[in-house]
Amino acid sequence: MTRFLILSAVLAGPALAGDTSPAQLIAGYEAAAGAPADAERGRALFLSTQTGGKPDTPSCTTCHGADVTRAGQTRTGKEIAPLAPSATPDRFTDSARVEKWLGRNCNSVIGRDCTPGEKADLLAWLAAQ
C-alpha cells in the first residue's frame, strides 16, 4: 500500500505542475482586477524603466531582453528561457511558479507587488509573442 501511495504521488507531480494555461491565468487576473487585460499596457510596463525597485534591475528587459522569444540572462550569467510561450510552450502553465516569479520580479523591478491588472496586462502581451 505504501508503495502505491508513493508511486501515485510521484506520477501526479508532473501533472500538477501544468495546472493552468496563459489564458486561464489572464482570466483569473482580469477577474481579480475587474477589468480586461490590455496587451499594449503589458508591453509598455515590460519595456519601461522603473525607479522604485532595485537599481541593478530597472526594467524587465535588464534580464529578459526586449525580444521575449529569445533567452535572457540573470545578473549572475545564468540563462533564462524565453518568456514567450511561442518559444517556451510550457511557460505560464504552473500557477504557483508564475506567482512566485511575478512576485519576485515585480518587487525587484517596480519595488512592489504587481497588481492583478498589471499581471493580466503583462501575460496578455507575453502570450501574444
From Swiss-Prot:
GO terms for molecular function: electron transfer activity; heme binding; metal ion binding. Transmembrane segments: none annotated. Heme c binds at C60, C63, H64. Disulfide bonds join C106-C114. Residues 1-17 form the signal peptide. Keywords: Disulfide bond, Electron transport, Heme, Iron, Metal-binding, Signal, Transport. The keyword Metal-binding applies. SUPFAM superfamilies: Cytochrome c. Binds 1 heme c group covalently per subunit. High-spin cytochrome. Transiently bind oxygen during autoxidation, which occurs with a half-life of 3 minutes with a 4-fold excess of O(2). Also binds carbon monoxide, azide and cyanide. This is Cytochrome c-type protein SHP. The lineage of its organism: Bacteria, Pseudomonadati, Pseudomonadota, Alphaproteobacteria, Rhodobacterales.
